[in-house]
Amino acid sequence: MKTKGKAWQLVVTVLLIAAFVYTAFFGVAVKYGDVTKIYIKGAQDIRFGVDIKGGVNVTFAPSDNYDATDDQLDAAQLVIENRLVGLNVTDYELYVDYDSDRLILEFPWQSGETDFDPEAAIEEIGSTAYLTFRKGSSADGELILDGSMVESAAAQYGPVSGSTSEYYVALKFNDEGAKAFGDATTELYQSSGTISIWLDDQNVSTATVNAAITDGAAIITSSASNPFTQEDVVKMARQINSGALPFALTVDSYSTVSPSLGENSLSAMVLAGLIAYALIVVLMTLLYRLPGFLACIALAGQVAATLAFVSGYFPVFESFTLTLPGIAGIILAIGMGVDANVITAERIKEELNNGKSLDGALKSGFARGLTPIIDGNVTIVIVAIVLMGAFGPSDGLFAKALHFVFFAFGPSTAGTIYAFGYTLLTGVLLNFVFGVFATRVMIRGAASIKALRNPWLYGAVKPGKEVKEKKPIDFVGLRKRFLTISTCLMAAIILCAAVFGVRLDTEFTGGAMITLSYQGEISTSEVQKTASTALENNGLTLQTGKNVATGEQTLKISMPGNETVTTDQVENLLTSLNEQYPDNAFAQLSLSNVSAAMGTKFLQKSLVAVVFSLLLILLYIGFRFKKIGGLTGGLMAVLALLNDLMVVFGTFVLLRTPLDGNFIAAMLTILGYSINDTVVVYDRIRENRALMGKKTPFEELVNHSVNQSARRTIITTVTTVMALGVMCVVSKLYGLDSIFTFAFPLMMGMLSGVYTSLCVSTSAWVLWNDRKSKKAETKKA
């Protein structure tokens, strides 16, 4: 028995996953009186986005009534965005009011959160952080260089001028900075002069020049009487890397805001997640028996590990803001995890029903299932890396690697898309740990236990029963019908968009933000109806909050559109609200006409990111499937993907949901999911080409492969759609339409994905080959 003596692997792996899941969700903490000491952070320590748990709204204005230009406001917006991402605050909205020189920022925070201080964050975000190196020890000494000549700054710990270790900041200059610093140190070295380093008007270090420094590097150290802490150097490096603000900022207003998805959004999603997981366990166990049940244990570990990378469970990884797009990334990663296990279980079942022994079926199933898993996951990794490179901080690894693609857009960030890429990349990499490695260890361990060696437990038919032969579907024969359906569907969606119009959120169009104060309790849904009538706009979004300085209850009304809101319109709004709700005493606090947080440049950059991702995927498919004409197949997969993306777009249009950052996340999710589905089908075609020989007609090869892949593709989609369906039902029960309008388009896109993977991409590929063959025959004739 080949697997004898490995039963302990099953027990140990299950116990390790169970312990990890428990600690990842609940953490480890000890309470000493009124003080709680957290040793391991759990899911409750995750910093959720504004959409889920609420946050802080702060308005910055130039200090001392400085008259900032539009270009300076744009530059300040970019610096603040980089600082937010540097703080791992990825869910934020930042708008510019050019008329009144205001920067309006909203970012997540919950009262009672202990490891994130919003006031300290606001202070850091709004500080000028102008770094200068000067000759001598005074602030008016001759300028040597400034922060614009610093290529990178890194917080370090170690010995500097002796055996004692200390915290310091290591700087690397660009060519201009290296020359300026080299010239200055060469000059001052001769006279034992000094160089002082200033951050704004604060002297952070002064040192005597003991040697000429021409290697383009320097360090910032502290004085012996006031040594740097780790927090000091991390903050300083972060500020230097994000750049200096073009003018000093002051806080004009500061208030807390409610969750944009609704007060019960987190509870609803937790409930939906538990129900969905229970249904997946039942379905996988019924379909695949023991491998299906063990796969669900591994899936729990994968979900827990993804949340652990977000919560700060691992001390080497800082906590990350979890937003609705971030959750979409986790959902896609879960779908990939289920898919990996379905592929393996289907292969084992197939080998058993072909007459192989249990050990032989496991060995062959694992080997044959690994290749499609790798190919499918690589395509998702490509998408995640491109997104993190395009929308992450400019000093990030992926941003530097992809600078040649996105340099024309300048340094810019989009935290929610970056968070989507982060959770997606983390989840997919963890899929190899849990969905591939852990599942296989557990199955091998189970197969070594005598009581668990019955082939039926692994998917085989019972002894004496024959495998039912299923009549194959003639997918290839229906190819013209499939392509006609897709063409008509896309035409119908374009027609609907033209007839009903496409609504855009404030993030894309800009618009107005009206902040009111009120007393007592209000129903935001009822107030929204009144406000929509008064302002003649049905695209309003409302958020309640509390002004930190005055204690007043606040209501923020966001109104997308190109037209500005006048004071007369606000007065009409107040009149309508106070007539309808006289006890609430609505009053105006502020009015801002803002620019788009995600404007034309964002849409252009998103398009470039998607096109570049598809190009890389096309090249990968062409390389991996070159023996079967993979480049053509890749092109057909990309064309079929347009069908899925149009379905998502059409669903948003029909639901009358404004297009925003969540729409971009939904489109990217379907892009990754659908491409993975198609790649797995292509992998089966490649495998069958080797088995069936080159003389087998391409139509027959494709038809046979699609029929073999159909069950796996449908089951994977059913499990993921089931999870999204539960989310839709629960969100409706809780009255959370904003979650429904995100989950439902995802669900429709995934249903479209299974259709295009089986029916459209392969049909288009066969049709292309048909025409190519006919042209070749015509030339011969």
Question: PLM features: what roles do these ranges have?
Answer:
Residues 1-781:
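A structural signal for conserved, well-ordered secondary-structure elements
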